[in-house]
């Protein structure tokens, strides 16, 4: 029997980006908040010290900062006819672990989804007709651009994003992204200093008639003090961002933007190494009354609260809803139910170029450093004669020249021996690449549920992922690969190779940690688990914050939109819910 603890106003599951933002906003509003974090305490000064953080073997290869599958594994299959099997190691995606979550080891790409993304079904239907959407399960998200844009602004200024605005209050700006939706003000910091490869990419894209612009980056281009008064340092371009924490205080993370302020507030409590097992509902199932969790000693405890906020990694949010019976489970056969619906991923391709006479210095890198074009992203180009909708941003980034992972060689090079050594020597300074980050649109048969066979160490069913790349997304990716082929020509490289996506999602090789959907927001409780404020339709004192709320995934990294949704939900709670608890949207 779990020991019942004194009641709190709010209990938050997880202290990554969303949990720290919700914690800061709700404590500022005067609420007593406790956050339960499954992983350990992690702090920049003591855990990410610059003296040992740049350890490629420990962090990039052995995945020291990531969730151990022994704590939470998942099963996967490509379609309903297959039997799902456990992923014994995380490969395709890498969830975070501990305070800061995946916000510790990310690169820093900080995009805004476009206005058309939030009304995607309406937008595409009006432009192309309903038949164009084929078997896609697209739906509008709920908020208008005017409603959600200020929340993007808050997250960008929290993080100190380095970039160049492309659309200021409807006026296209030179040097920025002409395809972005209108923003209220410029980025807080100017763009990063561009390395040779990205500069060369930008020049060639201009020659082809495209619109290159600097990647919006949560790596600091200059010293910065954010609105909470937290000081950040200028990026040193060390090349240790993705899979690493930043010991230089130069990459935005919960630790460098929010947590130092939050943990000093008297109405906030953080309990680490505490794993939430279940959200407990009232007998009628209409309200949450508490969460049950285990602490670091294995003791089972119950934390009552007036408000329960799930802020885990998106996949974990969905699993917690399923385990707690918050909302009806989605059924891909009937199409009914909402929890588990519209699981999406990211659809990518890439080009690798090798030269004889370059000197790229790839070790001068940063997580979010490069030039991008959005000419083939979203609906920036006409799809009328194409057999798909959606698109991809195409970027040339220079993230690292680390010795274990960065060994570019020409096609046909032996995998070992003297010729391999010579090829790696020649390729290191002479290789560059650019890649696409494509949209992932929902279909009926891609979804999340609980596995009927495999359980975790607490006896709870594992999350089961049923996913394969939809025909629409494969067609889109092949079209983008065709564009990449054309883009390689002006470089006159000695070798140029372009990858092409194949059906059959494989969970082993790393692809991207951009898992979205499963607990999606929307306007209709029959097709969405959450309303437009990320509040459960079925249990109104539960809010679920994260990429799990995305009704689809766009052709860009999700973190900027995750941060915006966190601020959007926090404002709804503080301005509306705490004044009049209950459903914020009536049906």
Predicted regions and their residues:
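Residue-level detector of alpha-helix initiation sites
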Residues: 16-17, 192, 196, 315, ...
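FAD cofactor-binding and catalytic pocket of flavoenzymes
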Residues: 78-95, 99-102, 106, 112-126, ...
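Beta1/beta-strand and adjacent pyrophosphate-binding region of the FAD-binding site
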Residues: 3-18
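Conserved hydrophobic helix-helix packing surfaces used for dimerization/oligomerization
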Residues: 10-12, 33, 542
